[in-house]
């Protein structure tokens, strides 16, 4: 079995999760300006030092937990990165040479989230439709769905799988968000009823922090929200329903371009 599978079993046996384990990194060596900024914007309060303890981001000796390390501005966890590519066409056959846009991001999960959403926004178009008294905005992708899918990828990915990172791949007709690690409970998402998925959390500390920052709801899964947002789009058709796929070591969300193949 791959080493990450053995590590998963060890953690399971200890009733511990990756994000709560203490790292070798000292809290005092890292800045958390993005986290502080977001906390202030969301709650209206400055982030007090003691919150780093109650958020389980550091231990009593001043060492960061893995969750803390993942949220440091300059995160020392090197495989926490985001690769974004806008491919030319419907697949990757043209290769990177032909890619229309590409970027790689590292740092705090908050940076990855913001940069990922910005990358998608700059690579999509918005159409307008005139109605009797106003005009309707029709973007290629529902920004809320992109946001939810990326939060999901960053928070629920398996950080024990090294040499793999989160990818956003944009094609002419769709975009995919890929993350290492299948469903935390070992099931296959494509065989499940999305409306009844209980949130088994691979990284409960990260999920809790993102909940406190207003990035995700404490209860329930983002899958339903991704699909509902799509269905509510002005230019939605049934064949454009978002697709979810997982296997033992990966998870992928496909969001379809709502304007692809339709007359302008």
Listing of model-derived features with the role each one plays in the protein:
Residues 1-164, 170, 186-188, 192, ...:
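Active-site helix-to-loop segments that bind/position phosphate- or nucleotide-bearing substrates
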């Amino acid at each position: 079995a791959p080493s990450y599978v053995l590590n998963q079993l060890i953690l399971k046996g200890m009733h511990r999760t990756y994000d709560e384990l203490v790292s070798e990194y000292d809290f005092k060596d890292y800045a958390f300006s993005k986290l502080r900024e977001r906390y202030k914007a969301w709650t209206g309060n400055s982030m007090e030092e003691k919150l780093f303890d109650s958020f389980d981001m550091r231990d009593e000796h001043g060492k960061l937990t893995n969750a803390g390390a993942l949220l440091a501005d300059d995160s020392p966890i090197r495989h926490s990165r985001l690769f974004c590519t806008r491919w030319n066409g419907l697949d990757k056959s043209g290769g990177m040479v032909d890619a229309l846009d590409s970027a790689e991001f590292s740092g705090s999960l908050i940076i990855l989230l913001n940069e990922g959403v910005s990358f998608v926004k700059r690579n999509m178009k918005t159409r307008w439709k005139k109605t009797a008294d106003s005009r309707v905005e029709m973007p290629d992708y529902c920004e809320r769905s992109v946001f939810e899918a990326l939060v999901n990828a960053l928070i629920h990915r398996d950080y024990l799988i090294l040499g793999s990172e989160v990818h956003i791949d944009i094609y002419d007709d769709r975009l995919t968000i890929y993350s290492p690690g299948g469903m935390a409970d070992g099931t296959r998402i494509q065989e499940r009823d999305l409306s009844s998925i209980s949130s088994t959390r691979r990284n409960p500390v990260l999920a809790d922090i993102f909940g406190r920052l207003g990035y995700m709801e404490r209860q329930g899964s983002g899958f339903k929200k991704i699909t509902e947002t799509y269905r509510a789009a002005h230019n939605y058709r049934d064949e454009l329903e978002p697709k979810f796929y997982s296997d033992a070591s990966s998870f992928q969300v496909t969001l379809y371009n709502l304007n692809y193949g339709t007359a302008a």
